[in-house]
Protein backbone atom coordinates (compact mmCIF):
# COMPACT_ATOMS: atom_id res chain seq x y z
CA UNK A 1 0.00 0.00 0.00
CA UNK A 2 1.14 3.54 -0.53
CA UNK A 3 0.38 6.74 -2.33
CA UNK A 4 0.86 6.77 -6.09
CA UNK A 5 1.34 9.83 -8.23
CA UNK A 6 1.69 10.85 -11.86
CA UNK A 7 3.32 14.16 -12.67
CA UNK A 8 3.34 16.17 -15.87
CA UNK A 9 6.22 18.67 -15.76
CA UNK A 10 6.60 21.56 -18.20
CA UNK A 11 10.40 21.68 -18.40
CA UNK A 12 10.46 24.81 -20.56
CA UNK A 13 8.12 27.11 -18.60
CA UNK A 14 9.96 30.15 -17.32
CA UNK A 15 9.36 31.43 -13.80
CA UNK A 16 7.56 34.42 -15.33
CA UNK A 17 5.07 32.40 -17.39
CA UNK A 18 4.50 29.41 -15.09
CA UNK A 19 1.65 31.03 -13.13
CA UNK A 20 -0.38 31.99 -16.19
CA UNK A 21 0.12 28.56 -17.78
CA UNK A 22 -0.93 26.86 -14.53
CA UNK A 23 -4.09 28.96 -14.34
CA UNK A 24 -4.98 28.16 -17.96
CA UNK A 25 -4.67 24.42 -17.37
CA UNK A 26 -6.47 24.62 -14.02
CA UNK A 27 -9.38 26.50 -15.63
CA UNK A 28 -9.58 23.91 -18.43
CA UNK A 29 -9.56 21.01 -15.95
CA UNK A 30 -12.29 22.62 -13.82
CA UNK A 31 -14.50 23.58 -16.79
CA UNK A 32 -14.08 20.06 -18.21
CA UNK A 33 -15.17 18.50 -14.91
CA UNK A 34 -11.88 16.65 -14.46
CA UNK A 35 -11.20 18.37 -11.12
CA UNK A 36 -13.33 20.44 -8.78
CA UNK A 37 -12.69 24.15 -8.36
CA UNK A 38 -12.88 23.94 -4.58
CA UNK A 39 -9.59 23.01 -2.95
CA UNK A 40 -9.61 20.43 -0.16
CA UNK A 41 -7.24 18.22 1.84
CA UNK A 42 -7.08 15.56 -0.90
CA UNK A 43 -3.36 15.34 -1.63
CA UNK A 44 -0.29 14.15 0.18
CA UNK A 45 2.41 16.60 1.17
CA UNK A 46 0.60 19.86 0.48
CA UNK A 47 -2.07 21.73 2.33
CA UNK A 48 -4.76 21.83 -0.36
CA UNK A 49 -5.42 20.36 -3.79
CA UNK A 50 -8.19 20.00 -6.32
CA UNK A 51 -10.24 16.82 -5.76
CA UNK A 52 -11.25 14.72 -8.75
CA UNK A 53 -14.33 16.04 -10.53
CA UNK A 54 -17.44 14.34 -11.93
CA UNK A 55 -15.75 13.58 -15.28
CA UNK A 56 -12.37 12.43 -13.94
CA UNK A 57 -13.20 8.84 -14.85
CA UNK A 58 -13.12 9.80 -18.53
CA UNK A 59 -9.43 10.72 -18.47
CA UNK A 60 -8.08 7.63 -16.70
CA UNK A 61 -7.84 3.91 -17.38
CA UNK A 62 -9.41 2.47 -14.23
CA UNK A 63 -9.71 -1.07 -15.62
CA UNK A 64 -7.12 -2.45 -13.19
CA UNK A 65 -8.42 -0.54 -10.19
CA UNK A 66 -10.99 -2.01 -7.82
CA UNK A 67 -13.48 -0.10 -5.75
CA UNK A 68 -13.78 3.64 -5.60
CA UNK A 69 -10.65 5.70 -6.13
CA UNK A 70 -10.13 9.21 -5.10
CA UNK A 71 -7.29 11.59 -5.18
CA UNK A 72 -6.44 15.11 -6.00
CA UNK A 73 -4.43 17.38 -8.21
CA UNK A 74 -1.48 19.32 -6.85
CA UNK A 75 -0.32 22.19 -9.06
CA UNK A 76 3.27 23.23 -8.39
CA UNK A 77 4.28 26.69 -9.57
CA UNK A 78 7.83 27.74 -8.79
CA UNK A 79 11.26 26.21 -8.79
CA UNK A 80 10.76 22.52 -7.98
CA UNK A 81 12.68 19.25 -8.19
CA UNK A 82 10.06 16.68 -9.20
CA UNK A 83 11.09 13.13 -8.32
CA UNK A 84 10.08 9.52 -8.72
CA UNK A 85 9.36 8.90 -5.03
CA UNK A 86 10.75 5.73 -3.47
CA UNK A 87 14.24 4.53 -4.12
CA UNK A 88 17.30 6.31 -5.39
CA UNK A 89 18.39 7.56 -8.81
CA UNK A 90 20.24 4.84 -10.72
CA UNK A 91 22.12 6.83 -13.36
CA UNK A 92 22.39 10.22 -15.02
CA UNK A 93 23.56 11.14 -18.54
CA UNK A 94 25.23 14.19 -20.03
CA UNK A 95 23.12 16.07 -22.59
CA UNK A 96 26.25 16.92 -24.61
CA UNK A 97 28.09 13.62 -25.01
CA UNK A 98 25.49 11.12 -23.71
CA UNK A 99 28.01 9.60 -21.29
CA UNK A 100 26.27 7.90 -18.38
CA UNK A 101 27.32 8.11 -14.75
CA UNK A 102 26.18 5.04 -12.82
CA UNK A 103 24.94 6.03 -9.38
CA UNK A 104 24.43 2.51 -7.99
CA UNK A 105 27.14 0.14 -6.84
CA UNK A 106 27.25 -3.62 -7.48
CA UNK A 107 24.99 -4.21 -4.45
CA UNK A 108 22.35 -1.80 -5.83
CA UNK A 109 23.16 0.78 -3.16
CA UNK A 110 23.68 4.45 -3.89
CA UNK A 111 27.35 5.04 -4.72
CA UNK A 112 28.06 8.00 -2.44
CA UNK A 113 31.17 9.11 -4.32
CA UNK A 114 29.43 9.15 -7.71
CA UNK A 115 26.30 10.77 -6.21
CA UNK A 116 28.07 13.58 -4.31
CA UNK A 117 28.34 16.21 -7.11
CA UNK A 118 24.79 15.45 -8.31
CA UNK A 119 23.46 15.74 -4.76
CA UNK A 120 24.69 19.33 -4.81
CA UNK A 121 22.93 19.91 -8.16
CA UNK A 122 19.60 18.57 -6.85
CA UNK A 123 19.70 20.26 -3.45
CA UNK A 124 21.02 23.48 -4.95
CA UNK A 125 18.05 23.71 -7.33
CA UNK A 126 15.65 23.18 -4.42
CA UNK A 127 17.43 25.96 -2.51
CA UNK A 128 17.28 28.41 -5.42
CA UNK A 129 20.85 27.96 -6.67
CA UNK A 130 22.00 26.75 -10.09
CA UNK A 131 24.86 24.34 -9.36
CA UNK A 132 26.59 23.86 -12.71
CA UNK A 133 29.07 20.99 -12.80
CA UNK A 134 31.18 19.64 -15.66
CA UNK A 135 30.42 16.29 -17.21
CA UNK A 136 32.97 13.80 -15.85
CA UNK A 137 33.44 12.45 -19.38
CA UNK A 138 33.52 15.41 -21.80
CA UNK A 139 34.21 18.20 -19.30
CA UNK A 140 31.53 20.53 -20.66
CA UNK A 141 29.48 22.42 -18.05
CA UNK A 142 25.91 21.19 -17.59
CA UNK A 143 23.06 23.29 -16.21
CA UNK A 144 20.96 21.58 -13.50
CA UNK A 145 17.96 21.00 -15.78
CA UNK A 146 20.21 19.67 -18.55
CA UNK A 147 21.12 16.35 -16.94
CA UNK A 148 19.04 13.37 -18.12
CA UNK A 149 18.12 11.10 -15.21
CA UNK A 150 17.34 7.43 -15.89
CA UNK A 151 13.60 6.86 -15.73
CA UNK A 152 13.24 10.63 -15.27
CA UNK A 153 13.91 10.11 -11.58
CA UNK A 154 14.51 13.86 -11.17
CA UNK A 155 12.95 16.55 -13.34
CA UNK A 156 13.69 20.23 -12.76
CA UNK A 157 11.03 22.78 -13.61
CA UNK A 158 8.87 25.73 -12.64
CA UNK A 159 5.50 24.10 -13.39
CA UNK A 160 4.13 20.65 -12.66
CA UNK A 161 0.78 18.92 -12.33
CA UNK A 162 0.83 16.00 -9.88
CA UNK A 163 -2.17 13.67 -9.81
CA UNK A 164 -2.27 11.82 -6.48
CA UNK A 165 -3.79 8.33 -6.31
CA UNK A 166 -5.43 8.41 -9.73
CA UNK A 167 -5.57 5.40 -12.05
CA UNK A 168 -3.24 5.72 -15.06
CA UNK A 169 -3.93 8.87 -17.06
CA UNK A 170 -5.05 8.26 -20.65
CA UNK A 171 -2.59 9.26 -23.36
CA UNK A 172 -5.17 11.53 -25.03
CA UNK A 173 -5.72 13.41 -21.79
CA UNK A 174 -1.98 13.92 -21.25
CA UNK A 175 -1.72 15.20 -24.85
CA UNK A 176 -4.65 17.57 -24.27
CA UNK A 177 -3.08 18.99 -21.14
CA UNK A 178 0.29 19.29 -22.85
CA UNK A 179 -1.28 21.19 -25.77
CA UNK A 180 -2.24 23.95 -23.32
CA UNK A 181 1.39 24.57 -22.36
CA UNK A 182 2.43 26.80 -25.26
CA UNK A 183 4.14 23.99 -27.19
CA UNK A 184 6.63 23.38 -24.40
CA UNK A 185 8.39 20.07 -23.90
CA UNK A 186 6.97 18.08 -21.00
CA UNK A 187 8.18 15.11 -19.03
CA UNK A 188 5.78 12.57 -17.55
CA UNK A 189 6.87 10.72 -14.45
CA UNK A 190 5.11 8.48 -12.02
CA UNK A 191 6.05 7.10 -8.67
CA UNK A 192 5.03 5.95 -5.25
CA UNK A 193 5.63 7.06 -1.69
Mark where each language-model region is.
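Amphipathic alpha-helical segments
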Residues: 21-30, 97-100, 172-181
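Residues immediately within or flanking Cys/His clusters that coordinate Zn2+
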Residues: 89-91, 132-135
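Long, contiguous alpha-helical scaffold regions
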Residues: 145-193
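Glycine-rich, often proline-containing surface loops adjacent to acidic residues and nearby aromatics
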Residues: 1-5, 91, 99, 152-162
